[in-house]
Structure formats: structure tokens, C-alpha cells
């Protein structure tokens, strides 16, 4: 008895042969069986079949991975597990870009990463200061406990005291102490703590700056000096006192056109230093009427233009500079520094509107806004209409959401408290940290 040979059916045969369970010759355009029977030979669309099978396989894999942690690709290095290293990592990847107005261009590194972060490898003092600032920022983000930030801050303060008690310090040690003192000011800014504490650190930085005798100035020293000058003006305005002077120098002398520390032009900053000095003298009861008129004229004549080809970062710097100019004029007017008849209420309204527009433009650009606290505070205090106040609160909210620094929340609370006063005056009832 002969055994019937089992035919091997092809997976790629025509539809007729597959339905009749016959082996297909797979001839094109018609197989042998369909040709003999005189019927239409139809082959399936294998592209659709393959896609369907692939999609089904993908679904099976997805179902198998439900509830299982899947590592997603990332452009950033994995976050270190060590706490201290994690704080350095946060400062490097997040915080440094929030407190600097460096241009994101090739060959223009962030100055904090260039002049501060490398010092953490050789100086425990700078390391603790950087970690304290980063931990404070993470605390505000809800990613770290407040106790950890406090511990690191205490370590940085203790090391600072120990180092300063030494009878002699070399140049490297002094620069590390200077970097640490300035970072501790940022610690107060991030947590919105005390303008007085920040002023104490500023006074320590002043002494260290005065000890420097090297000429020409190395780049890191120029960077530290600019940070000092920025906080010198902002803290003086916060506390309504006169700025500090370095070796009797009446004010900053910057040569660069655009500055990466405070996003302002160098030609305007000496005028802001003069403004802080006059406001401080006025709070002490001094007569500044003549000098304030001169400063107002200089502020009115100062200008900076932007072109259609200006990139967003440069445009933000321009608008920040303009907001400082107009808020400086508003402060002089509100402080009663000028009673000249040529300054009318209409002019005040025009200056206010210009300051308001510049602050709003910076917000719309959605770039680093770290130096916007003071002009936003000034414009906010003068906002009287419901619409303007609504916009101001929106800018504060966006500012806080972008930077997550309590100094912004403190300024917002002070502005809202000012609005609630029955007859709000310009004088601050308590120091407001601005920086």
C-alpha cells in the first residue's frame, strides 16, 4: 500500500490555492492552477499583512511590559546617587542657567560654570556653598528637605568663619572665600530670607575684593566683582541704604557693552549705583534735590535700541535695561527727589507705562528673569488699575514658576500688601529683599 506524500503548502501562494489547501506554483501574474482552471489569480497584499503582524507583536510586547519600569532615553547624564554630588549636578544643569544671563552660544560658557563650579573640586568651602544654594532651590521645588539645606548652609558658614580667622591667606584662598560669600547671598535670594543677612555677606565680599591687587584683573575676578556690584545696588535699594564702596571707589566701572551677570548694559549700571546712593541718602534725611535732577536728566537721555534682527536673549537684555531706566526715574519721582514743574503727572504715567511694557516684554520672551525682581516690584507698587494688577500678578506667577526662588514670592507679597493699604505711601514698612 502506497503512502500519499504530504504536500508542503507555501505561505506566499495565491488566495485560491490557499483556500483550496493546494500547493501554489507562485507564478506571476497567474499561478499554474489558476491558469489551468481559467480563473482570476489573486495574491494577498503582503505589505499590509507584515504591518499587521508587526503591530500585533508590538501590542504583545507592550502588554507584557505593563507595570514594569522602563528606562527612557535622556539627553542628560543620569542623576548621581550621592547627595552632595546630586546638589552639584543640580547647580550645574539647572540653577546656574537661572541666575546668569549668559548667551547660549558656542564659545560663550556660563560664567558660573566657568569660574565657580571648578572650585568645588579643590575647595570644600566653595563646595558647601554651592551645595547649600542647590539644596535650597531643590527644597523650594519640593525635591529636598529644608533641614538638608540648613545643614549645608551651616557648614559653609562655619568653614567661612574658620578660614577668615587665619592670620594669612593666599590669593587662591581669598578668591575661594569671595566665591563662597557671594554664593551665600544667592542662598538668601533663593529662600527669600533676610536682606540684612545678605548685606553681611556683601560686606565680607567687599573686604576680600579690596585685598586684590593683581593687574590686569583675571576674568574670574572681574566676574566676582560684577556679582558684587549687582547685589551692592540691589541690597542697598532693598534696605534703603547707601551702597558700599570698594577702596573709596564711588561706583562700578564696566567696559563691556552687555553683561552676563545682570542682563543689563554697562553704561546704565553706574546710573543705577548713583540712584541707590541718592535713595539711601534721602532716607537718612539728606537733601538730594539738585543731584536727583541731574540723575533724572541722565536717565532720560540714556537709551538703547533693538533691531529686527536682534535675537531673543539680546532683546530680553534690552528690555530689562529699559525697565531699570524707567523704574529709576519712577523711584526718584516717588521719593520726592524732584519737584520741578516740568515733571507732570502725565509724564509720570508715560514713564510708568514704558516700565510696565518693558517688564511685560521680558515676560513674553520667557527667558531668564532673575534680575527682574526689582523693576517688577517697583511697577507692581505703582499699578493702580485692576487690569494692570492682574497682569503684574500673572508676571509674578510666571517668574516664580520659571525660577522657583522665594525672593520672587516675597516681592509679590509685599506688592499685594501695598495694594491693601488705605493710602499707600512709597516708603517701605519693612525691608523687602530684592535681587
Regions found by a protein language model. Give the residues of each.
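Charge-rich, intrinsically disordered regulatory segments
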Residues: 1-109, 119, 407-435
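Cytosolic regulatory protein-protein interaction regions
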Residues: 108-111, 115, 239-374, 378-401
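Acidic/serine-rich, low-complexity amphipathic helices located in mid- to C-terminal regulatory regions
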Residues: 80, 85-86, 93-95, 99, ...
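Hydrophobic/aromatic-rich effector regions of fungal transcription factors
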Residues: 113-119, 129-142, 152-195, 205-211, ...
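Short coil/turn connectors between adjacent alpha-helices in alpha-solenoid helical repeat scaffolds
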Residues: 140-149, 188-201, 238, 282-285, ...
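Start-of-helix signal in alpha-solenoid helical-repeat scaffolds, especially tetratricopeptide repeats
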Residues: 128, 178, 222, 226, ...
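Internal amphipathic alpha-helical repeat/solenoid segments
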Residues: 2-6, 69-173, 350
Amino acid at each position: 500500500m502506497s503512502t500519499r506524500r504530504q504536500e508542503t503548502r507555501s505561505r506566499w501562494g495565491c488566495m485560491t490555492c490557499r483556500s483550496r489547501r493546494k500547493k501554489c506554483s507562485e507564478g506571476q501574474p497567474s499561478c499554474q492552477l489558476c491558469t489551468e482552471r481559467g480563473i482570476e489569480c489573486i495574491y494577498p497584499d503582503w505589505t499590509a499583512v507584515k504591518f499587521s503582524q508587526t503591530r500585533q507583536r508590538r501590542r504583545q510586547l507592550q502588554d507584557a511590559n505593563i507595570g514594569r519600569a522602563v528606562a527612557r532615553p535622556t539627553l542628560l547624564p543620569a542623576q548621581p546617587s550621592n547627595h552632595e554630588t546630586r546638589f552639584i549636578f543640580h547647580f550645574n544643569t539647572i540653577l546656574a542657567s537661572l541666575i546668569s544671563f549668559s548667551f547660549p552660544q558656542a564659545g560663550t560658557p556660563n560664567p558660573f560654570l566657568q569660574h565657580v563650579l571648578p572650585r568645588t573640586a579643590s575647595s570644600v568651602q566653595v563646595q558647601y556653598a554651592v551645595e547649600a544654594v542647590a539644596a535650597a532651590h531643590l527644597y523650594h521645588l519640593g525635591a529636598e528637605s529644608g533641614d538638608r539645606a540648613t545643614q549645608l548652609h551651616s557648614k559653609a558658614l562655619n568653614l567661612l568663619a574658620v578660614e577668615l580667622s587665619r592670620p594669612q591667606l593666599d590669593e587662591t584662598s581669598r578668591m575661594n572665600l569671595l566665591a563662597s560669600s557671594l554664593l551665600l547671598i544667592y542662598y538668601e535670594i533663593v529662600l527669600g530670607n533676610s536682606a540684612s543677612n545678605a548685606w553681611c555677606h556683601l560686606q565680607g565680599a567687599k573686604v576680600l575684593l579690596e585685598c586684590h591687587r593683581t593687574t590686569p584683573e583675571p576674568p574670574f575676578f572681574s566676574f566676582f566683582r560684577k556679582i558684587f556690584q549687582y547685589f551692592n545696588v540691589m541690597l542697598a535699594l532693598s534696605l534703603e541704604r547707601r551702597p558700599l564702596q570698594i577702596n573709596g571707589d564711588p561706583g562700578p566701572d564696566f567696559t563691556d557693552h552687555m553683561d552676563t551677570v545682570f542682563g543689563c548694559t554697562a553704561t546704565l549700571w553706574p546710573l543705577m549705583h548713583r540712584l541707590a546712593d541718592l535713595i539711601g541718602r534721602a532716607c537718612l534725611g539728606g537733601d538730594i534735590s539738585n543731584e536727583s535732577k541731574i540723575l533724572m536728566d541722565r536717565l532720560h537721555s540714556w537709551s538703547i535700541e533693538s533691531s529686527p534682527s536682534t535675537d531673543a536673549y539680546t532683546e530680553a537684555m534690552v528690555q530689562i535695561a529699559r525697565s531699570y531706566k524707567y523704574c529709576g526715574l519712577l523711584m526718584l519721582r516717588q521719593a520726592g527727589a524732584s519737584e520741578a514743574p516740568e515733571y507732570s503727572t502725565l509724564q509720570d504715567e508715560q514713564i510708568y507705562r514704558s516700565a510696565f511694557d518693558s517688564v511685560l516684554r521680558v515676560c513674553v520672551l520667557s527667558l531668564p528673569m532673575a534680575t527682574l525682581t526689582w523693576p517688577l516690584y517697583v511697577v507692581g507698587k505703582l499699578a493702580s488699575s485692576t487690569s494692570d494688577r492682574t497682569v503684574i500678578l500673572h508676571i509674578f506667577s510666571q517668574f516664580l514658576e520659571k525660577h522657583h526662588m522665594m525672593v520672587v514670592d516675597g516681592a509679590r507679597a509685599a506688592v499685594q500688601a501695598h495694594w491693601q493699604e488705605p493710602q499707600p505711601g512709597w516708603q517701605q514698612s519693612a525691608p523687602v529683599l530684592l535681587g
